[in-house]
């Protein structure tokens, strides 16, 4: 038997629900890769005979393999920063007050409208490199900092180009309904018409999006407007997701679940009826501990209810310049545990198996199983819990992407 590569002297956190051990763990394990897929995984003692002279053999030095990390919610492509707003918040201004005074998302929109594609690409590349160094092999990138046809398309084109020129896979989400631009301040319905009738068709014509998102909140879009955008996305054949229940309980999550959303994100104010709706529809709940931390929120997502109703919990960075300027997947694992009280295993599942489900790619990534794409990381750790327990020590020693060893 011949394989493209074999890993030995390793432990594997498969994250597969088919294995009853915590983390789906296999200790004293081995893993084989062929044609970019996982060809064999199990105990090293059970490893079939193979051509040891013709097969590259890698030793994990007693560390751990996990699936490649998946950051399922980012706003990675933007220009400028909002450090001034950081100072304002520390002096007592609320996120909502800043947004209503013309700051917040709109200030980043203005910077993105002025930036060209080359500038946005380079900024995005640097941020994607930072995530990749921490073991991220797939990332979702949203638009939403254009709020006009030209800039929304520009951001999505840059996201697609990043995916073509980086080993990290990029899934794109059209978030034209992120905020109401100043020019539509007194006619938000007209802006929704623009998103549906002009922006979305152009996005589809260039194949720039895998999904559509909306910010459903009292400072952004109401339930009726949100449903209009999501329904148009469904009619166009795209997946849907939603920023919901971040600042108040508007019922957006239940509505999105009814429409078959892949995920609802933030959900600090989600109630039991909303959780039940997610459970019944198979919609994921995406937790964004970076925003919770940075905005110094006190309303916690309903973790116990999500467990009770067995809703898949996703952990993501929400990397953005206003509410989560924290470009670190590993920091999110730690915060998910320390701030939101997930277990380390739940947090890691939230950035592997469940994150893949939220992006609709769980048929080929998110767990270590035979037949899945060979996307995995090798960590210099003694237990998978270390990924959430400690922070600041680089422990990702190797990454395999599509069966190819990536030099970090």
Curated annotation (Swiss-Prot):
Its cofactor is Zn(2+); Fe(3+). It is an enzyme of class 3 (hydrolase). Fe(3+) binds at residues 73, 75, 243, 318. SUPFAM superfamilies: Composite domain of metallo-dependent hydrolases, Metallo-dependent hydrolases. Pathway: Amino-acid degradation; L-histidine degradation into L-glutamate; N-formimidoyl-L-glutamate from L-histidine: step 3/3. Keywords: Cytoplasm, Histidine metabolism, Hydrolase, Iron, Metal-binding, Zinc. N-formimidoyl-L-glutamate binds at residues 145, 320, 322. It holds the Pfam family Amidohydro_1. Its EC number is 3.5.2.7. Coiled coil: none annotated. Binds 1 zinc or iron ion per subunit. It catalyses: 4-imidazolone-5-propanoate + H2O = N-formimidoyl-L-glutamate. Catalyzes the hydrolytic cleavage of the carbon-nitrogen bond in imidazolone-5-propanoate to yield N-formimidoyl-L-glutamate. It is the third step in the universal histidine degradation pathway. This is Imidazolonepropionase.
